[in-house]
Amino acid sequence: MDRRTFLGISGSTLASLASGASLAAKEQKIESLPDYKPTGVKLLTETTPAADGFHFPAEWAAHEFTVMVLPPPQNWIGYGIPLDDVRGQWADVANKLSEYEAVLMVVRPEDKAIAKRIFSKDIQLVEFPVNDGWSRDSGPMILVNGKGERRAAGFTFNGWGGKFPPYQDDALLKARLCKHLDIPMYPINWVLEGGAVAVDGEGTLLTTEQCLLNKNRNSATDRSKIEKVLNNSLGTKKVIWLGNGLEPDPITDGHIDGLAAFASPGMVLLHTTKDRNDPNFAICQDAKRRLKESTDAQGRKLDVIELPLDADLSHINFYIANDCVLVPISARRRDNDRALGILREVFPKRKTIGLDATVLGEGGGGIHCITQQVPKV
């Protein structure tokens, strides 16, 4: 298969991104823990989420609402896509999602007027400064315990390895949101984006070596240390390591949410291709082998459901919401139909809805990348 793009990023765009990212990484220092105190968020610094009995629930657990962020122009200028088209696709996702659960949309003060015009009146707006619109990565990862309480894992955000400065407002977004929502936050001096991990809610976490072992995130690449940070912060018990994410991906460095996702405890959806000439063939086969050889935190062998690769975007980058699954689709009807058919079988109790995500793909993401759930307690 001739894969001109991954998630819809053209070859020329990739080249410019790669050179720009390299320059940005040299010019912008990779920062550590931000100063959260001016946000007024309640910080929990004396213990860890796991020690306090908190964990990050699976995406299919009931949501109170979903956090999204209306993208500003900053990182879209070089894509040659009208900003109205970009925001229009965000609005398509948000408006459809709002039919199934509440949506909290973060907007810059100067964008409030356009937000009121393009979003459903059911969507709540909150004003904060932001640098980009990928709430999966910059938003808070909300944890729960058995007492009906919520706290947040405040991982550090550094603009995907310093590639897209400035990112200081995005680095503070989780703290500002937690203050707004009155949710205490554990400040974690470790860089992690939400799209880099997937959990099953029963102690198992999926990730990729390509992202988490990348020194543009954290200097330490010792697996045991990384696993300890993840388990202590997200309440997981076992980390399953896949190798690389799909290629090419100069932005996220192989986020798991473009390659694989838990569908339920013990079941993993995995993108695969039968085209041996596809550079992703070996990546997908390696991921499949690792999953088949693994057991989860409960000792179960994993059931791996293969989802055929689309030439233009990642169908795996779906979002499991209350009573529905929102799936990125492209202009390739045959690829869409195959993916949607498989997902309808996997999620029989939810309505599977395909939404055009080609513009999201041009920016290197999908529906999962622009959504972050707040679990119901």
Residue map of PLM features:
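The feature marks the mature, well-folded catalytic cores of soluble enzymes
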Residues: 26-377
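N-terminal export signals
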Residues: 5-26
